[in-house]
Regions:
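Conserved C-terminal beta-signal and adjacent last beta-strands/turns
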Residues: 20, 219-222, 234, 351-352, ...
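N-terminal periplasmic "start-of-domain" segments of outer-membrane beta-barrel proteins
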Residues: 32-60, 90
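Extracytoplasmic beta-strand/coil segments of soluble accessory domains associated
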Residues: 68, 72-108, 112
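Short acidic/polar hinge/loop motifs at secondary-structure boundaries
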Residues: 109-136, 155-157
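Short strand-turn segments of transmembrane beta-barrel domains in outer membranes
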Residues: 150-151, 156-184, 194-195, 200-207
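Flexible loop and strand-edge segments within Gram-negative outer membrane beta-barrel domains
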Residues: 200-207, 211, 225-305, 332-339, ...
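Outer-membrane beta-barrel signature, preferentially recognizing the C-terminal barrel domain
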Residues: 245-268, 387-400, 404, 410, ...
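Gram-negative outer-membrane beta-barrel transporters
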Residues: 315-321, 356-357, 362, 467-469, ...
Length: 625
């Protein structure tokens, strides 16, 4: 905690010093596109992969108050919450696992080496988000490991103006919230600071929480070179009734801290664009089995990752060449998982080519990743070291193909290899009931997709069908009931699915805006049986999923949104959840009322943790320039 606060203080002092330097001539900062993916930058509708963007307008209109709720409104995404306000949530894409999804902030990877359960610890307040880009499919070629089924990139606000806003809210379960956002422009720079505080007594026994979030962003110049810096800190303390272990474990408790600091810039020279970034990411997790008596069972894990990434785009006679290199060092200190140290090197290259007056585009690519502490084995089921182990780079190629019938309609297809290395929990976790396996090899899959994209003025439509053949998937197995679960690479899973998304924006009168978004997904898994008598791996993906939002303006001051979710998991009954939000604007004030689960549906999303019934939240926001 002290190291984190010191880092943020140093960052703030450094930025303030830069800001304080005055220039005689005011400099207009250009937009710095620090992300959006490391690959070739083209409009999402023209990409030959599955890309969906949640705009700032959609975020503002949404019934969601956090990213977990927001992503639940997208077909093909499965955010499984334990409790409210996203205190603990797992992120799944297209039926994969929570360890197979990568989260990024402004292009900085925030995966956790301990476990994918911590992926959503580093999410940001909605107030500081410009948009969210969602890449589905084999994304490891672009982003590296963990992007097994896709990647989600949170892009922070770029347009920073002179503005201060305050917000207060309260509601069911004794929820209390407060936030302040300060945006300030200077002669040659700008800065955005946001602080959020949320707390609740919980919607049932031992589900109370306290959550503090701090975010800073600044654009400034050093010797006429534009630099963007970000820093974020998220502190959570929450009761975890039935969150892990079993539903009978009602007295669990957890505290997590996640933080990130990053700097990025852009160099342009003729036909070359270079985008370097430097970053540090930290996560701390303290878990106790009995909140009243931590000495019974307590785990403490602290991970740190320092990295540098450089991506480049080069125009050439064939089209555009994308190159990238990512070097990082990750450490973990844990009373259960031990002391771990990992060096990682990831390089990738892809060449986009266009033919027939740019109607046909072809993008082959390849990526190579090396981990200092992970080997391959000729026998993935082995639990003992042998001469068959070699520490070699992982190589995974892919290719994208698209055909534009016209400016509105595109047919696309892609195929590529993807992978996910085991977490330290998979390898080294030890308890009376579960034993890791340090000799696990990486999961791998071949993913292919065929889809169409149609975009016309205020209407857009996408449809895609995909196949993922995964092997060496990690499962926990045993032959006798009295034995502990042991991790092994024994699963083979073939996943077939399709998705449909449609958006339409229209106007009634001179100011009444209406926007409808509809999504549908279907997943079918074919799980190969194993030789073991007992398996802990249970397919629980969303078999069918329907999402819909309808936002509309009654007049220039009143706007409302209805969010609909219908889902059915394998071997479970389907459920429907309906949320509603209405806002009233008067001068500098905005009053909002959110009604969640209006139908009072009884349902669970994971681990038999019941979600709350009908609940409400009332908030007020004051903004001044």
């Amino acid at each position: 905690m002290k190291k984190l606060l010191l880092s943020i203080l140093i960052f703030n002092t450094f930025v303030t010093h830069i800001i304080a330097q005055e220039n005689k001539e005011k400099i207009e900062l250009e937009e710095i596109e620090i992300l959006s993916s490391p690959r070739i930058q083209i409009e999402s509708s023209q990409n030959s992969i599955s890309v969906l963007t949640i705009s700032q307008e959609q975020i503002n209109n949404s019934t969601a108050t956090n990213i977990s709720e927001l992503l639940q409104q997208i077909a093909g995404l499965d955010v499984r919450r334990r409790g409210i306000e996203g205190m603990q949530a797992d992120l799944y894409i297209r039926g994969g696992s929570f360890d197979q999804t990568l989260l990024l902030i402004d292009g900085i990877k925030v995966e956790d080496p301990q476990t994918g359960h911590h992926t959503m610890n580093m999410t940001l307040p909605l107030e500081v988000i410009e948009k969210i880009e969602i890449v589905k499919g084999a994304a490891s070629r672009m982003y590296g490991q963990n992007a097994f089924t896709g990647a989600i990139n949170i892009i922070t606000k770029k347009d920073i103006e002179n503005n201060i806003s305050f917000g207060l809210a309260g509601g069911s379960f004794d929820q209390k919230r407060g936030n302040i956002t300060i945006q300030k422009e200077y002669e040659n720079s700008n800065i955005l600071v946001n602080y959020n505080r949320k707390e609740s007594e919980g919607y049932r026994y031992n589900t109370d929480f306290k959550n503090d979030e701090l975010f800073l962003k600044s654009n400034f110049k050093i010797k006429n070179q534009k630099i963007t810096g970000i820093a974020a800190f998220n502190d959570r303390k929450f009761g975890a009734n039935g969150f892990y272990a079993s539903p009978e474990a009602i007295d669990q408790y957890e505290e997590t801290q996640a933080s990130i600091v990053g700097f990025s810039t852009i160099y342009e020279n003729n036909n070359i664009l270079i985008k370097p970034k430097l970053y540090w990411k930290r996560n701390q997790d303290m878990y106790v089995y009995l909140r009243q008596d931590p000495s019974v069972y307590r785990n403490l894990h602290i991970s740190n990752k320092v990295g540098i990434e450089v991506n480049a785009l080069l125009n050439n006679k064939f089209g555009m060449l994308g190159l990238g290199i990512d070097i990082s060092n990750t450490t973990l200190s844990s009373n259960n998982l031990g002391q771990r140290d990992r060096k990682m090197l990831h390089v990738f290259a892809e060449q986009q080519m266009k033919f027939f007056d740019s109607k046909l585009d072809l993008t082959p690519g390849i990526a190579i990743t090396y981990f200092s502490d992970l080997a391959n084995s000729t026998d993935p089921n082995s639990t003992e070291n042998s001469d068959g182990w070699t520490n070699v780079p992982h190589i995974y190629p892919g290719i994208d193909l698209g055909y534009n019938f016209n400016e509105k309609f595109k047919l696309y297809s892609n195929i590529g290899y993807t992978f996910r290395i085991p977490t330290y929990t998979d390898q080294f976790y030890t308890s009376p009931t579960t034993v890791g396996n340090e000799f696990l090899v990486y999961e791998k899959a071949l993913t292919s997709e065929l889809g169409i994209k149609y975009k016309k003025e205020n209407f857009n439509l996408t449809f895609s069908a995909y196949n993922r053949a995964a092997s060496d998937v990690i499962d926990y197995v045993k032959n006798e009931e009295s034995e502990p679960w042991r991790a092994n690479n024994i699963r083979e899973i073939t996943t077939l699915g399709f998705e449909f998304n449609m958006g339409y924006k229209f106007y009634l009168g001179s100011f009444n805006t209406h926007q409808i978004n509809i999504g549908f997904s279907n997943i079918n898994d074919d799980l190969k049986e194993t030789e073991f008598n007992f398996s802990r791996y249970a397919l629980n993906s969303l078999k069918n999923q329907i999402t819909s939002t309808y936002s509309f303006e009654l007049n220039s001051k009143i706007s409302s949104t209805i969010a609909f979710k219908n889902a059915r998991r394998l071997n479970e009954e389907k459920y429907t959840v309906l949320d509603f939000k209405t806002s009233y604007k008067y001068e500098k004030f905005t009053l909002s009322i959110i009604l969640n689960n209006i139908l009072d549906t009884e349902y669970t999303e994971t681990n038999l943790v019941p979600m709350p019934g009908f609940n409400s939240l009332i908030g007020i926001k004051y903004s001044i320039n």
